[in-house]
């Protein structure tokens, strides 16, 4: 699973005890939280001994009474004992993200800062293609070695 930072929130699916949940990837959350309205009624929960900070005022905070089996978005095996409260969407915290092997990467630019300035001055818009309609190639293509030594510059 991968998600590029954009206007859209990074959400992914997880299967907990055989039930599918969708949640927001939240690297700032220590623990995962399931929305109270999505928590199955027959799954045991208990009043939480600790409160939740950073999600506003949560009057009712519970925690699963059991450690639950979980499959991540790419079927990563994990376990979780989530918190449960009234929030609009589920949050996948670092307790699960670490087990899933989640990474945050910021790739190095494909082009040097100088070439980026030149391209921008000539009207290039990052993420768009080259050309009048901005529909040209969006990523550089790889030069391939001609092992057979045929074609331009080589006798046939």
UniProtKB/Swiss-Prot annotation:
<keyword id="KW-0068">Autocatalytic cleavage</keyword>
<comment type="subunit">
    <text>Active as a homodimer.</text>
</comment>
<dbReference type="Pfam" id="PF01585">
    <property type="entry name" value="G-patch"/>
</dbReference>
<feature type="domain" description="Peptidase A2">
    <location>
        <begin position="21"/>
        <end position="96"/>
    </location>
</feature>
<keyword id="KW-0378">Hydrolase</keyword>
<dbReference type="InterPro" id="IPR001995">
    <property type="entry name" value="Peptidase_A2_cat"/>
</dbReference>
<dbReference type="Pfam" id="PF00077">
    <property type="entry name" value="RVP"/>
</dbReference>
<keyword id="KW-0645">Protease</keyword>
<keyword id="KW-0064">Aspartyl protease</keyword>
<dbReference type="GO" id="GO:0075523">
    <property type="term" value="P:viral translational frameshifting"/>
</dbReference>
<dbReference type="InterPro" id="IPR034170">
    <property type="entry name" value="Retropepsin-like_cat_dom"/>
</dbReference>
<feature type="active site">
    <location>
        <position position="26"/>
    </location>
</feature>
<comment type="similarity">
    <text>Belongs to the peptidase A2 family. HERV class-II K(HML-2) subfamily.</text>
</comment>
<protein>
    <recommendedName>
        <fullName>Endogenous retrovirus group K member 9 Pro protein</fullName>
        <ecNumber>3.4.23.50</ecNumber>
    </recommendedName>
</protein>
<dbReference type="GO" id="GO:0004190">
    <property type="term" value="F:aspartic-type endopeptidase activity"/>
</dbReference>
<keyword id="KW-0814">Transposable element</keyword>
<dbReference type="GO" id="GO:0003676">
    <property type="term" value="F:nucleic acid binding"/>
</dbReference>
<dbReference type="InterPro" id="IPR021109">
    <property type="entry name" value="Peptidase_aspartic_dom_sf"/>
</dbReference>
<dbReference type="InterPro" id="IPR051592">
    <property type="entry name" value="HERV-K_Pro_peptidase_A2"/>
</dbReference>
<dbReference type="GO" id="GO:0006508">
    <property type="term" value="P:proteolysis"/>
</dbReference>
<dbReference type="InterPro" id="IPR000467">
    <property type="entry name" value="G_patch_dom"/>
</dbReference>
<dbReference type="InterPro" id="IPR018061">
    <property type="entry name" value="Retropepsins"/>
</dbReference>
<dbReference type="InterPro" id="IPR001969">
    <property type="entry name" value="Aspartic_peptidase_AS"/>
</dbReference>
<keyword id="KW-0895">ERV</keyword>
<feature type="domain" description="G-patch">
    <location>
        <begin position="111"/>
        <end position="156"/>
    </location>
</feature>
<comment type="function">
    <text>Retroviral proteases have roles in the processing of the primary translation products and the maturation of the viral particle. Endogenous Pro proteins may have kept, lost or modified their original function during evolution.</text>
</comment>
């Amino acid at each position: 699973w991968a998600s590029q930072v954009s206007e859209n929130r990074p959400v992914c699916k997880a299967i907990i005890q055989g039930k599918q949940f969708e949640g927001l990837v939240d690297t700032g959350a220590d623990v995962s939280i399931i929305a109270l309205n999505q928590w199955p009624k027959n799954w045991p929960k208990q009043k939480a001994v600790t409160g939740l900070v950073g999600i506003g005022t949560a009057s009712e905070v519970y925690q699963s009474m059991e450690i639950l089996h979980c499959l991540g978005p790419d079927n990563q095996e994990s376990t979780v004992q989530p918190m449960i409260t009234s929030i609009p969407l589920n949050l996948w915290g670092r307790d699960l993200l670490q087990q899933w092997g989640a990474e945050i990467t910021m790739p190095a630019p494909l082009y040097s800062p100088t070439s980026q300035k030149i391209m921008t001055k000539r009207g290039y818009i990052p993420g768009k293609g080259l050309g009048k309609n901005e529909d040209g190639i969006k990523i550089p293509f790889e030069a391939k070695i001609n092992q057979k030594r045929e074609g331009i510059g080589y006798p046939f």
